[in-house]
Amino acid sequence: GGEPIHFLKKRRPERTRNIVTLCDVSGSMSLYAQVFLAFIAGLMRADQKADAYLFHTRLVRITEALRDRDAMRAIGRMSLMADGFGGGSKIGVCLDRFVSSYARRFVDGRSVVVILSDGYDTDQPQVISKALKKLRKRGCRMIWMNPLKGWRNYAPVTAGMKAALPHLDLFATANTLSDLA
């Protein structure tokens, strides 16, 4: 007997996600790099917890440079950091460096890691795969935004992109401004 009791379920409070961007600035990405950097700069202004990196053959953290309120000084800082801009790409090596250094401090289960790259890499594909597997162990979400994916008849045929796909939560198009929104 008695009256039925209705338990109120408590919902967990929504916690903000930490956004970490890694932007490929190698030669094959030179057409898109400026737009992606503007996108990342806007993200950094909108979210004080966001973190940002450039990569080509090496990885460079650009968070502080993008937060500089003096635009000319920020551009100067970026140009000093981006030595190698428009050159080759070693995505796997750069991702591995990110995982073994910065990810320990800036990536956890509330993080979303956004990689802006076409996937063209001079490393062996297993280097990308191993790095993304290690990053996945940190509990983050991973989004790979590829500007080539918006092309008609695009298929991820590069070895590096194929190696990355199984580790991603989302493989998205990034060839228009609306794709980045």
Locations of regions flagged by a protein language model:
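Exposed acidic/Ser/Thr-rich ligand/metal-binding surfaces
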Residues: 92-141, 172
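Short beta-strand-loop
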Residues: 54-78, 158
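Von Willebrand factor type A / integrin I
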Residues: 132-181
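Short acidic, S/G/P-rich loop/turn micro-motifs used as interaction or catalytic elements
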Residues: 28-30, 120-124, 151
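Acidic, polar low-complexity linker/tail segments
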Residues: 1-19, 30, 34, 42-51, ...
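Cofactor-binding loop segments of dinucleotide-utilizing enzymes, especially the Rossmann-like FAD-
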Residues: 55-57, 118, 147
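Short hydrophobic beta-strand that contains or immediately precedes a catalytic carboxylate
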Residues: 20-24
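Von Willebrand factor
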Residues: 73-111, 153-156
